[in-house]
Structure formats: structure tokens, C-alpha cells
Regions:
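Glycine/small-residue-rich phosphate/adenosyl-binding loop
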Residues: 100-171
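Iron-sulfur cluster-binding cysteine motifs and their immediate structural context
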Residues: 1-10, 22-39
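Short Fe-S-cluster ligation motifs
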Residues: 14-31, 53-61
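Small-aliphatic-rich amphipathic alpha-helix that forms the alpha element of a beta-alpha
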Residues: 62, 81, 85, 156, ...
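N-terminal, charged amphipathic alpha-helical interaction modules
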Residues: 87, 93-96, 107
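Short, conserved, surface-exposed binding loops centered on an aromatic residue
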Residues: 91-93, 144-151, 181, 213
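C-terminal helix-cap and adjacent tail motif
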Residues: 48, 139-143, 212-231
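Extended interfacial segments that mediate partner engagement and assembly in macromolecular machines
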Residues: 45-79
């Protein structure tokens, strides 16, 4: 794609550029210009790199959180959290992830109820998960334990276009970044597996509750973005 011209490096095959930024990143003096990653929009990394031990301990500290404070994360906190996902690797540097953030407690409860209804329908249809879903429903409906939405003050749905064959793997990469970053800004996360499975199954009552879902998109991941309980 790149070759050395009379005035420096040039792009010989513009259509083949995926805007990965590698050509710009490797320049030791920051002199390389690329129209997809222009110099004026670049942010140099000035902090010292983590040493091996610090990086190892940082990766080990990742934990799922399933008990949350009732306080709803602010828009600023959520923006910080979702912004870091832009730097996650995606197939062909496609990015293309969309997010639906839900902070309305009534709607979160309605989503959990819809998932419970879906489980009942799956049980009636003889699903392979029949026994597991029956156990979940006994906890959720008989004992009042919210093991579906975990009483989370906030839900974040990751969306990808239906024709995007790498949407699920892209979302998983993005969430991995978010999960590692969340504790640094006082947030905790966990995968909402039951809601995710229901959404991926295309259960219409759940889809109807996601008013912000763009056309021609599908749910690939659902995750809580919420405040961690301390102590």
C-alpha cells in the first residue's frame, strides 16, 4: 500500500487502506501524514509504559460485579467507558459498534420480565435449557431474586449490523477493554447473559422495549455498566 515517493511515503492503493494507523504510529518523529489518521487528530502516548509485573497484576484484577449501588452512572462516566472501546481491535479495523444505554429503572425491570417470559416459552417448547431456565424462574419469580438484571441501575446493549459476520467477536473485544477500564473510574461490570441470549434469539417483546434499536441491526452483547459496591 505504501511506497517511498519523491516527497516521502505515499499511498499507492488508497482503497486498500483500513485506517489502522500503523504507518503513522511507527514513525519515530511523528512526521507521517495519512488522511484517515491526520496528525492534528492524533494524541501521543506520553505516560510511561507498564512494566511486566504491573501489567500482569492489572490483567489479573478483572472481576465481574453482581451487587450494585443504586446510584446511576453519569453520562460523563458512561461516555468515558464507551470511548475506550474505540481502541479495541476489530476485524479489518471495521469498528462499527453501536450502543444503547438504558438507565430507566422501569424499563430495566420490564426487560428482565420479558426475559423471564421468554424462558417460560422456551421451557414450553422443550428447550435443551429447560431445567436451567426453570431454576432461574424459581429464583426470579418465586423468591424475588433478580438474577436476570441484578437490579443494575444501567444496562448497555452492543449492536452490530445484521450482515456484519464479525459483530459478535468485535463486541467481545470492545467489552474486554471496557471491563478492564471500568474499575479505574469507579464502575463495575458483568455480562448480562440471560438478557444477551434472549436478545440474540430475537425475542420480539424484548426488541420492542429497545426503542433506540436502529433498523437492520442486531443485539450481540448486553452488559451492565454500573457503580461497584464497596465493602
Amino acid at each position: 500500500i505504501l511506497s517511498m515517493g519523491e516527497e516521502g511515503p505515499k499511498c499507492d492503493f488508497d482503497r486498500g487502506c483500513m485506517a489502522c494507523g500503523h504507518c503513522v504510529a511507527v514513525c519515530p518523529v511523528g512526521a507521517l501524514e495519512n488522511k484517515y489518521t491526520p496528525l492534528e487528530k492524533q494524541r501521543p502516548i506520553t505516560k510511561p509504559m507498564l512494566d511486566e509485573e504491573t501489567a500482569y497484576e492489572f490483567m489479573r484484577m478483572r472481576r465481574s460485579v453482581r451487587n450494585f449501588k443504586p446510584a446511576v452512572p453519569s453520562e460523563e462516566e458512561l461516555t468515558k467507558l464507551l470511548n475506550i472501546t474505540r481502541y479495541a481491535p476489530t476485524a479489518g479495523n471495521s469498528q462499527g459498534m453501536y450502543y444503547v444505554v438504558i438507565r430507566d429503572q422501569e424499563r430495566i425491570k420490564a426487560i428482565a420480565d420479558a426475559v423471564a417470559d421468554w424462558m417460560e416459552e422456551e421451557i414450553a417448547a422443550g428447550s435443551a435449557n429447560k431445567r436451567y431456565f426453570m431454576t432461574v424462574l424459581r429464583a426470579y419469580r418465586d423468591r424475588g431474586q433478580d438474577i436476570i438484571a441484578r437490579k443494575a441501575p444501567c444496562l448497555v446493549f452492543a449492536l452490530a449490523r445484521r450482515l456484519n459476520n464479525t459483530g459478535v467477536s468485535n463486541a467481545e473485544q470492545c467489552w474486554a477493554y471496557a471491563e478492564l477500564f471500568a474499575p479505574t473510574i469507579g464502575l463495575g461490570t458483568t455480562i448480562a447473559g440471560f438478557i444477551q441470549e434472549c436478545g440474540i434469539a430475537g425475542y420480539q417483546p424484548l426488541i420492542d422495549l429497545l426503542e433506540e434499536l436502529p433498523p437492520k441491526h442486531k443485539i450481540v452483547v448486553c452488559q451492565y455498566k454500573v457503580i461497584v459496591i464497596i465493602g
